[in-house]
Design a protein with these regions (language model features):
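HIT superfamily nucleotide-processing domains
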Residues: 1-382
Length: 382
């Protein structure tokens, strides 16, 4: 019998169509063609003039901005949907409201290597990528005109990636998006009724049950949500209660997040043959005012990964109710098995692999592999 499951945080309903269910391994992807050649890629070293001037770069001391030598580079998006220019005043357009699209759009280039998606990056490089997320998040959080910062990663053409070179995107905008408001309202309601954070409760319940847990380390729990909207939807959440991603501890927590993200994405890579996916970070942008007090208590930042293995069709668009043809318990078990196998990704042309093989214990904390990562002191350009 198909099930309807309700999301504890938002109240949304999801249909888990068990009679239409497919085996998790039936989602393995076919081989893909390259999206863009390296000789025309604006994100490759040597092509720095093809992008706007960098706003942040991790590079060896003594190297010039907007030149080769970097291992992380952040630039404004050339085709920005939001801009930090007008004042954003609302105006009438007949019976409708309109306003200038105030905000900033940035591209965070994860690696100089054109063909190194996040699952194959050395562990130290993923840490540096996470550090760039934190640096840019904190920078935009200081702007009083901005209300929300979203960091996202699109992998593969079906997920919206127009360039193959690994890169994330940042949107800092002057309004609160509906998805965040929906989560915030659910968190407020639960906090008022139960006196605790709904995300903390969810994490504790998932760890206790265990059937939807994919991976754990000392700081983060990776799990398939009970009311997952799509096959293999997976969340990464800090066990420490913290509302804003900007408050991530850039020591142990940064390393633990990098590990959790890389291990999970590599399980997708190994088990589903590098599927297209999106991930994004939901976070409260705290301004230090009175309203932030309850948000700090009730909300909890987290990262959501949604592989593009099914299509939202007329029913989903018409009702807002998603149909998931894989039980979250089954997808979590499948990913756990891939992690336990510890199979490494294919070697690149040089024979190097992205990360060292892991011990077959999905819940054990392991040190981030550091060989092959940037070894020199960081230089952050303004």
């Amino acid at each position: 019998m198909p099930q309807l499951r309700q999301d504890l945080i938002t109240g949304r309903w999801v249909a888990v169509a068990t009679e239409r269910a497919r085996r998790p391994d039936s989602f393995t992807q076919a081989a893909k063609e390259s999206i863009a050649a390296r000789d025309v890629c604006p994100f490759c070293p040597g092509h720095e003039s093809m992008t706007p001037p960098e706003v942040l770069a991790y590079r060896p001391p003594g190297t010039m901005p907007n030149s080769e030598g970097w291992w992380i580079r952040v630039v404004p998006n050339l085709y920005a949907a939001f801009r930090l220019e007008p004042d954003g005043q609302e105006q009438r357009a007949g019976r409708f409201w309109q306003r200038d699209a105030i905000g900033a759009c940035e591209v965070l280039i994860s690696s100089p290597d054109h063909r190194a998606p996040t699952p194959l990056l050395p562990g130290r490089q993923v840490e540096e990528m996470v550090q760039s997320y934190v640096d840019r998040y904190r920078q935009h959080a200081r702007n009083p005109t901005l209300e929300h910062v979203l960091i996202l990663y699109n992998h593969g053409r079906p997920a919206g990636a127009s360039l193959e070179h690994p890169h994330s995107q940042l949107y800092a905008i002057g309004l609160l998006p509906p998805t965040y408001l929906e989560e915030l309202e659910g968190a407020r309601r639960f906090f008022e009724q139960e006196g605790e954070c709904v995300f903390c409760r969810t994490i504790a319940d998932e760890r206790r049950a265990g059937v939807r847990v994919v991976f754990e380390n000392e700081s983060f729990t990776v799990f398939a949500p009970y009311a997952a909207r799509a096959p293999f939807e997976t969340w990464i959440a800090p066990r420490r209660h913290v509302a804003s991603f900007g408050d991530l501890d850039t020591g142990r927590e940064k390393s633990a997040l990098a590990e959790a993200l890389q291990v999970t994405l590599r399980a997708f890579y190994d088990g589903l043959n590098d599927p297209p996916f999106n991930y994004y970070i939901h976070s409260a942008l705290l301004k230090g005012n009175v309203a932030d007090a309850w948000i700090s208590d009730a909300y909890h930042w987290h990262l959501e990964i949604v592989p593009k293995l099914s299509i939202a069709a007329g029913f989903e668009l018409g009702t807002g109710i998603w149909i998931n043809v894989v039980k979250p318990e089954d997808s979590a078990a499948f990913l756990r098995e891939r992690i336990a196998e510890g199979a490494g990704p294919p070697a690149d042309a040089s024979g190097a692999r992205g990360v060292a093989p892991r011990e077959p214990r999905f819940s054990a904390m392991r040190a981030i592999e550091t060989s092959g990562g940037p070894g020199e002191r960081l230089r952050r350009s303004p």
